[in-house]
């Protein structure tokens, strides 16, 4: 049987991304916040730093109430950096209104095992357009 090259780390990250995409699709700020560590640092689409569950929930609660937002994660790379730590990098393409051009960003997460579950402890997005 040929190996797909997929690892347990990839499965963990894929599971979190699936939950994240589902919660984003309904703009469920509580469900999104539940995916983050109590010690999370979060840089989203604005310049503010949000911290912990409350900060992440506040960020998502403040977003416009789009009817059917979607996100697609591509070019995902993972590294099991330590027994309880996973590093993630990829691309996230957000479509927030039907017919609109997607907002495509680079995304990095650091995922940590917290209380027996995997949680995002660091979230950062940045422009795919070169700044320099």
Give each language-model segment a name.
Residues 1-31, 41-132:
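A beta-strand edge to alpha-helix "cap/lid" segment located at domain peripheries
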């Amino acid at each position: 049987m040929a190996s797909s090259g997929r690892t347990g780390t990839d499965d963990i990250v894929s599971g979190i991304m699936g939950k994240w995409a589902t919660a984003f699709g309904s703009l469920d700020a509580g469900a999104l916040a539940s995916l983050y560590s109590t010690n999370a640092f979060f840089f989203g689409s604005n310049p503010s730093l949000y911290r912990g569950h409350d900060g992440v929930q506040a960020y998502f609660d403040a977003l416009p109430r789009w009817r059917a937002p979607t996100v697609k994660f591509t070019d995902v790379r993972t590294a099991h950096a330590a027994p309880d730590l996973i590093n993630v990098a990829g691309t996230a393409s957000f479509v927030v209104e039907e017919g609109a051009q997607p907002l495509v960003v680079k995304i990095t997460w650091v995922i940590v095992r917290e209380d027996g579950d995997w949680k995002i402890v660091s979230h950062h997005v940045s422009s795919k357009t070169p700044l320099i």
